[in-house]
Regions:
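Classical eukaryotic N-terminal signal peptides for Sec-dependent ER targeting/secretion
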Residues: 1-13
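Catalytic-loop region of hydrolases
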Residues: 10-120, 131, 138, 145, ...
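Alpha/beta-hydrolase active-site loop
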Residues: 142-170
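Alpha/beta-hydrolase fold nucleophile elbow
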Residues: 168-185, 190
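Short glycine-enriched nucleophile-adjacent loop
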Residues: 186-200, 205, 212
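A catalytic-pocket lid/entrance helix-loop region that shapes and gates access to the active site
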Residues: 201-326
Length: 546
């Protein structure tokens, strides 16, 4: 697939923290950050086609007089054909948007759509992330205005009223021009929820890997991983986890101390914390892209099976080596390649030292994990708020007893829910939603969750082995089964793909199924865009006004 000259001069920053250990991975799309010199050229204020701008957004849409905050957005109107032409909106969701400036270009599906339909790309930062937060301190009280309904209202208000610098006469606001939502992961689900809660605001929606169903006990997160990872590695990893759980549940104090020592976790007081920490490297699966090559996940599997790195003599199809070999093999890799410097990497004074493992104690209320209330905290505090408050939950847990598990069953839903109180202690009358009795069932009834079949011009894309597939419309656990493709709601399940693999052109360059999916999405969005103009709703490419 050919891309513009702009693509060739930026670097793609893709590492989503391989050292995941303290909290479950958040549902975010893969980062794609422009090099500084390229971004500086895009943000040059002397020209109007590209740049950075700010939108005064209501803090509380139910009470506009309460005040506003500055919501940051970036724009690229290089492909825009003038007032009345389409606008493609992308938000990375629950992360600062500065790492996603590549989504302004045709190195990503947003830019491909813009090029095809003659539209502009607008990258909007989500409330409470990056520079787009109304409060510097993320206290329980300050976070009261971070919820799904306020977030949906943000994008509706922006689409309808933003004075885009490249659109001098306002002819490209929603209703006057077709706005197209393209999002991945939470932002993919958010696009579907906007269509559910504010239908018609966006003319068309592309939702990639969107977990639309809130789930309290989300053991199903690991099911696609088990289906996609090498079978021998899955069998052996599961055997290790069962063994570790058995010791912490039924073993003597000496046996529990020995297994902690084996994994370098002798200073972790609680067995469930130690078991969760031993399980944590399985999370590396989510960040794999189709061009990732020899990723951390496969290095771990090689180590468990006793393969030398990049070995060719033995294949993943060979049988499992069994617990007797897998346990010491995994412990050696864990203590050599995974654990050293893990806590230190977060940058807090209390966690300095390569062998420091204090970060793994989730019972310590004074831990920086719970006490850092700044926007720049390292623990996705604001996302943790949404999981506890809306509540999305998505607590990633061990499988039921009648199924193999690759994550400790000691880290159950209550293990994660317990941490909500440590993250967000009550301040006067202010607390989080699930403490007030809100449930996943309530949220799903509000958004329609898995029952989003009756939508217009919404394109669903999922990866076969994406762990967030289990909460998506393509879920095998959906009572009606994975959604079937229709003309109004096309659906593609990409064979062998993981999380949001259709968003970046480099994945299409590496995989024909992804390329075909990107082509299908772009073609369908273009057809829907033509329908907007043919229906008389607006005029494309009105003369530009200076």
């Amino acid at each position: 697939m050919k891309v513009s000259m702009l693509q060739s001069v930026f670097s793609c920053v893709l590492t989503i923290g391989t050292a995941v250990a303290l909290t479950p991975p958040v549902p975010i799309p893969p980062p794609d950050k422009l090099e500084e010199n390229v971004f500086a050229a895009l943000a040059d204020s002397s020209q109007s086609e590209t740049g950075i701008a700010y939108f005064e957004q209501y803090i509380d849409h139910d009470n506009p007089d309460f005040g506003t905050f500055s919501q940051t957005y970036w724009y690229n109107a290089t492909f825009w054909k003038g007032p009345g032409s389409p606008v493609i909106l992308f938000t990375p969701g629950e992360i600062a948007a500065t790492g996603y400036t590549g989504y302004l270009t045709d190195a990503t599906i947003t830019g491909l759509i813009a090029k095809e339909v003659g539209g502009a790309v607008v990258l909007v930062e989500h409330r409470y992330w990056g520079n787009s937060t109304p409060y510097e301190e993320q206290s329980t009280k300050a976070l009261q205005f971070l919820n799904l309904d306020q977030s949906v209202a943000d994008f509706v208000h922006f689409a309808r009223t933003a004075k885009l610098p490249f659109d001098k006469n306002g002819s490209s606001n929603a209703e006057s021009a077709p706005w197209i939502w393209s999002g991945g992961s939470y932002s993919g689900a958010l696009g579907a929820w906007v269509e559910s809660l504010a239908p018609g605001t966006f003319w068309a929606t592309h939702s990639s890997s969107g977990p639309v169903q809130a789930v309290y006990n989300y053991w199903e997160y690991f099911y696609p991983i088990q289906q996609g990872m090498p079978a021998n590695c899955s069998e052996d990893f599961s055997a290790v986890i069962d063994h570790v759980d058995g010791i912490f549940l039924h073993g003597s104090e000496e046996e529990q101390a020995d297994i902690k020592q084996m994994f370098g976790l002798q200073d972790v007081p609680h067995g469930d914390d130690a078991a969760a920490a031993i399980s944590a490297p399985i999370w590396a699966w989510q960040s794999i892209q189709l061009y990732s090559g020899y990723s951390t996940f496969y290095q771990m599997c090689d180590a468990i099976e006793g393969f030398a790195p990049n070995a060719t003599a033995l294949k993943y199809g060979d049988g499992a080596v069994g617990l007797e070999k897998a346990l010491p093999n995994y412990a050696k890799w864990y203590t050599t390649n995974y654990l050293p410097g893990l806590c230190e990497s977060y940058g807090y004074d209390d966690w300095q030292g390569e062998d420091n493992i204090l970060c793994l104690d989730t019972y310590n209320a004074s831990s920086p994990m719970f006490m850092d209330w700044t926007e720049s905290n390292a623990f996705a505090r604001t996302w943790a708020w949404m999981t506890c408050n809306d509540p999305f939950f998505y607590w990633q847990t061990g499988a039921p007893e009648d199924r193999p598990t690759v994550f400790s069953r000691l880290a159950n839903a209550e293990y994660w829910q317990r941490q909500c109180e440590l993250f967000f202690p009550q301040e006067g009358e202010y607390t989080y939603g699930s403490k007030r009795g809100k449930t996943a069932e309530m949220l799903n009834e509000h958004t329609q969750g898995w029952h989003l079949e009756d939508t217009k011009r919404l394109f669903w894309v999922n990866g076969e082995f994406d762990p967030w597939r289990s909460a998506s419309m393509a879920s095998e656990f959906r009572p009606e089964g994975p959604i079937e493709s229709t003309p109004e709601a096309p659906a593609i399940l990409i064979p062998g793909a993981r999380h949001c693999n259709d968003l970046r052109v480099t994945n299409a360059d590496a995989n024909e199924d992804v390329k075909n999916t990107q082509d299908a999405v772009v073609k369908q969005i273009a057809e829907w865009t033509d329908e907007f103009y043919s229906s008389g709703k607006g005029r494309r490419g009105l003369p530009r006004r200076s």
